[in-house]
């Protein structure tokens, strides 16, 4: 697949995305069907017979399925199970293992029922207190297996709508607990709906560009192995490049792709954040944000969780990815018809320290 992408002419990248990366309708329906089966199981029967009452307040689809950026053939989904039993972030950290254990037990038990035709293949975890339960789901009506990560989470946000922002007090509590526990970014799952909403309303073509960048990242991962920066960092970098460099619904895909790879090569200068869900207005949040933004670069703060620097702590991974990006910038997918390089968007690598409402 690497050969196909790098040798694709720049003016045919949209076609490449359409043919190789966009999931077809039947595939999407399969994944949706599998998710519905699992959501019903988690909400209605998983905790039905537990000794102590367990209340699932909601099950939220996260990851690429939730954001609408799934790649063709990549049938995976994150399901975040919000439990009213958790009373704090620390409580989630300490008790998530017991709920994962219960979900695992119920998956095994339901398989014994003859009328239940869905099969679960649970992946073993060696961690004593795992963040997620990973398994594969298969069923007669599905064309292929679907991989799931189920993550128990504290329902700190309650009801979330597209147009309302969290109370700043939620972030002050988050920051306080993360500092006392030394667990920055540990509770990002609690903000899954905000992460999803941040991307969900974006233009279709931007989501296609995200798919292209994710595909490129997967090719790099196959070639380079670990360590690499997290894929989410590349997704956010793509959104940032589009917002600051173009921002229109229709754009040149090759120019956008080139811009993102150039930003990867400048990783040591990156300092990126958004003020959509949190900002500098609350003194405690402002103090913490300034501290985060003074950290060694690259810094890319999760737009939903200020404690999560999704680009941090992996200089070697960025160095290796940047080296690969420099190679790719010489390939035909970044050349015009006459052989000259495709131009890139003008994008600052360092976001100004001001309250930017996007």
Curated annotation (Swiss-Prot):
The reaction(s) this protein catalyses: 3 ATP = 5'-triphosphoadenylyl-(2'->5')-adenylyl-(2'->5')-adenosine + 2 diphosphate
Catalytic class of the enzyme: transferase
Region annotation (Interaction with dsRNA) ranges: 14-61, 201-211
UniProt xrefs under PROSITE patterns: 25A_SYNTH_1, 25A_SYNTH_2, 25A_SYNTH_3
Major location category of this protein: cytoplasm
GO (cellular component) term, any one: cytoplasm
Cofactor field: Mg(2+)
Binding annotation for Mg(2+): 76, 78, 149
Function: Interferon-induced, dsRNA-activated antiviral enzyme which plays a critical role in cellular innate antiviral response. In addition, it may also play a role in other cellular processes such as apoptosis, cell growth, differentiation and gene regulation. Synthesizes higher oligomers of 2'-5'-oligoadenylates (2-5A) from ATP which then bind to the inactive monomeric form of ribonuclease L (RNase L) leading to its dimerization and subsequent activation.
Name this protein carries in UniProt: 2'-5'-oligoadenylate synthase 1A
């Amino acid at each position: 697949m690497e050969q196909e992408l790098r040798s694709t002419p720049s003016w045919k990248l949209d076609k490449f995305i359409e043919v190789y990366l966009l999931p077809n309708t039947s595939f999407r329906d399969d994944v949706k069907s599998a998710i519905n089966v699992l959501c019903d199981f988690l909400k209605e029967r998983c905790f039905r017979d537990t000794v102590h009452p367990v209340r699932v307040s909601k099950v939220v689809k996260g990851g690429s399925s939730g954001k609408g950026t799934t790649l063709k053939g990549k049938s995976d989904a994150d399901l975040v199970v919000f439990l009213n039993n958790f009373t704090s972030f620390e409580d989630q950290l300490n008790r998530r293992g017991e709920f994962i254990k219960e979900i695992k037990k119920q998956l095994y038990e339901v398989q014994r029922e003859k009328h239940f035709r869905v099969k679960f293949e649970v992946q073993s975890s060696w961690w004593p207190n795992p963040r997620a339960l990973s398994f594969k789901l298969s069923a007669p009506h599905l064309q292929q297996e679907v991989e799931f990560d189920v993550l128990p989470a504290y329902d700190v946000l309650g009801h979330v709508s597209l147009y309302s922002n969290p109370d700043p007090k939620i972030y002050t509590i988050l920051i306080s607990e993360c500092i006392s526990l030394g667990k920055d970014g540990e509770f990002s799952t609690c903000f899954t709906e905000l992460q999803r909403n941040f991307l969900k309303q974006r233009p279709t073509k931007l989501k296609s560009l995200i798919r292209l960048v994710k595909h490129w990242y997967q090719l790099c991962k196959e070639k380079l192995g670990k360590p690499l920066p997290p894929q989410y960092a590349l997704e956010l970098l793509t959104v940032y490049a589009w917002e600051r460099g173009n921002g229109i619904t229709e754009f040149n895909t090759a120019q956008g792709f080139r811009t993102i790879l150039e930003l990867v090569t400048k990783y040591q200068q990156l300092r990126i954040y958004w003020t959509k869900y949190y900002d500098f207005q609350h003194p405690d949040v402002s103090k913490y944000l300034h501290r985060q933004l003074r950290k060694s670069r690259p810094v890319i703060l999760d737009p939903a969780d200020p404690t999560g620097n999704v680009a941090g702590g992996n200089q070697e991974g960025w160095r290796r990815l940047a080296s690969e990006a420099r190679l790719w910038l010489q390939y035909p997918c970044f050349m015009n018809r006459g052989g000259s390089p495709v131009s890139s968007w003008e994008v600052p690598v360092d976001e100004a320290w001001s309250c930017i409402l996007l």
